[in-house]
């Protein structure tokens, strides 16, 4: 099978139009059609790596010459490199790799990686049922190397400008297309994105054009409120020694910080043979009670055995993660995404709260037991002095401050001062100086935090944090009570409008937000079917646009926990979702190109999605009946003016 066009675009060569259009489009400009990508993916972690493989293995993508490429800011592939600590284990089954849930026969599976490296039998003989994080990183890097032609590294996306057709009737026979800057008031005419990219090695800036964008760039550090000002101050001095370290930067930060801490320790205690007291020891704090906090806690004790390392958290105890079969199935199986999507907001919130124990502020049981046993043996079991190893007298300690909250953070020249409230002792306040503080407080994965999407905020309400935080419980609950098989298309439309995103991860444009019709299930005054036709263009899979340049779509991955479930940012779903995205992208090709492909999607991803559709009316309508149903939906919306969409209407 020949590879689709995504495999011939590396490295990104500066094309004629790219060099000609170094700045954002100020008026009309022309773009060569052969320079337009069907998809540009921003970020190249597991989510987009899985998608690139799915596209390569898709027969339909080959037949239609689907042109895709991915951009990664780092100079090479990496997966959570900041916490690649010795002994750290993967927290998910290795069968939830890049491909297996989409196509178990793919050569990009974890087990084929082991086989190709001649160690499948040795892996089977391992006692641990999951690979180390080190081995999983090696697997991902192996797959990424095989996809090298699909990605350009060292490419920083600066901004994205939405473009519209300059002519209402473009000439399909021309090799170029005329475009102009799009207006948020006419987002339904948005047909292209201009992506401005800086090459990190040369500083050169080029523009690329794409019909579809997919964003999967991970998250930004989530900081407790008390730490925000100190963090911001430190960020303004990027070349200084970091005393406040988030887990997302742990190993790179330690390259600077560790020598400084060892130097400070030797200055305080120049005589290595003398007895150490607490005033001479390094003091290090770890904030949080989850997996990353625990790993940093143990690693810091290993790096600085004579230091006092304190773990500070609000909970009563460290809690094990629930990775039992029933819970894993209920929270992370692929079909749960459909179940979650179709549920009301009230039900989705309950599920998120219920299944937090699988992923948030929890620790793998084996690591938890290892830590508990080490602390018990070291601090509870006392040997007679004559039997003690001489180094024990110099040893530091690990300690935990549970039920404790940090209320004030004061940066110092050589450390951080924390004021803490001890909720076990009548909210008593205590202030302690630490040489460094480490935050295992998680990440924020909202697309509203991505600066390069700033120009698109007027076009997509879901990019606005305030819009996303509005209360829609009543409207969502009304939708869930209104479900009628006959009107499933209408119900699906309302879900998309309320959430600002579709089931297949496309953001809903502002022009589709007919607020009266969306929020009450009514057509707005004077709207009728014409008003809702704009909505139908933007949602489901309908295309009321030119044959050669359908409407542009923005896919967002990893920031949709509230609408698609806990697995959205996790490895559990990447393979299956890659198949869904492949199907969605191919369905949105121009009609003239779709006609060149065989009628059936022959890749396993398509069959996987089709299988899911049998149990999900939403997926079935979205992926197989949307275009035929669009006009029917519009007629229904008009006919239902003034009526709620319930079974008795």
From Swiss-Prot:
InterPro entries: FAD/NAD-bd_sf, Lys/Orn_oxygenase. Its cofactor is FAD. Its EC number is 1.14.13.196. The keyword Oxidoreductase applies. NADP(+) binds at residues 289-292, 314, 359-361. GO terms for biological process: ferrichrome biosynthetic process; intracellular iron ion homeostasis. Binds 1 FAD per subunit. GO terms for molecular function: ornithine N5-monooxygenase activity. Catalyzes the conversion of L-ornithine to N(5)-hydroxyornithine, the first step in the biosynthesis of all hydroxamate-containing siderophores, such as ferrichrome. This is L-ornithine N(5)-monooxygenase. It comes from Mycosarcoma maydis (Corn smut fungus). The gene is SID1.
